[in-house]
């Protein structure tokens, strides 16, 4: 299936008034995780633009350190994904505790970058965009259009870059399994 880039959402949709933002339910982690995953899928191009702006600013101020930092994070991420696919215990951990898995990747990257050089580049150039994405995805309430687009991604009608990343983190399999078990019930 061909990878499609999600459209850039309008500013009014991406950052509307305060009525479209809400505090996540910290007691229901699966619901919060679902909101984050769905917002990451729906607003992925907007998040990419925000991250690109932050990376460009930090990269302009310190290009070599930004290149080293980005390379380290990508290599650590790919290494952890590869190991988790080959080691069953890590695969289960990644599936049960996705936030912990991402934190381990970020901490490993942090220590490698601190060993290699400039930690501030890591903090502002790599961690800040991820933090901004997570905060927005956690607080932004979903709308009907968001839900419809996410269903296309879940059932495989559409494949996007964020969908590929979330698949690598095994965050979409549960949704597909739920949908697959729901379809026969609807037919009855």
UniProtKB/Swiss-Prot annotation:
Main localization category: endoplasmic reticulum
Chain segments annotated as coiled-coil in the UniProt record: none
Subcellular location: Endoplasmic reticulum membrane; Cell membrane; Cytoplasm; Cytoplasm, Cytoskeleton
Cytoplasmic domain ranges by topology: 1-35, 78-93, 136-188
Name the record gives this protein: PRA1 family protein 3
Taxonomic superkingdom: Eukaryota
Record keywords, A-Z: Acetylation, Cell membrane, Cytoplasm, Cytoskeleton, Endoplasmic reticulum, Membrane, Transmembrane, Transmembrane helix
Family: Belongs to the PRA1 family.
Modified sites of kind N-acetylmethionine: 1
InterPro entries referenced in this protein's UniProt entry, alphabetically: Prenylated_rab_accept_PRA1
GO biological process: cellular response to oxidative stress; glutathione metabolic process; intrinsic apoptotic signaling pathway in response to oxidative stress; L-glutamate import across plasma membrane; L-glutamate transmembrane transport; learning or memory; negative regulation of L-glutamate import across plasma membrane; negative regulation of mitochondrial membrane potential
């Amino acid at each position: 299936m061909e990878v499609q880039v999600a459209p850039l959402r309008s500013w009014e949709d991406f950052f509307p008034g305060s009525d479209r933002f809400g505090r996540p339910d910290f007691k229901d982690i699966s619901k919060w995780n679902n909101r984050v995953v769905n917002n990451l899928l729906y607003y992925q191009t907007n998040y990419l633009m925000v991250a690109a702006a932050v990376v460009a600013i930090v990269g302009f101020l310190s290009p070599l350190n930004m290149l080293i930092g980005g390379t380290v994070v990508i290599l650590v991420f790919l290494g952890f994904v590869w190991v988790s696919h080959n080691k069953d215990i890590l695969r289960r951990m990644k599936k049960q505790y996705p936030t912990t898995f991402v934190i381990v990747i970020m901490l490993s990257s942090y220590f490698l970058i601190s060993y290699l050089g400039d930690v501030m580049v890591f903090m502002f150039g790599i961690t800040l965009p991820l933090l901004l994405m997570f905060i927005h995805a956690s607080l932004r309430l979903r709308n009907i259009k968001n839900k419809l687009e996410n269903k296309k991604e879940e059932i495989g009608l559409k494949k996007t870059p964020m969908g590929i990343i979330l698949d690598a983190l095994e965050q979409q399999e549960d949704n597909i399994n739920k949908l697959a078990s729901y379809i026969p019930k609807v037919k009855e």
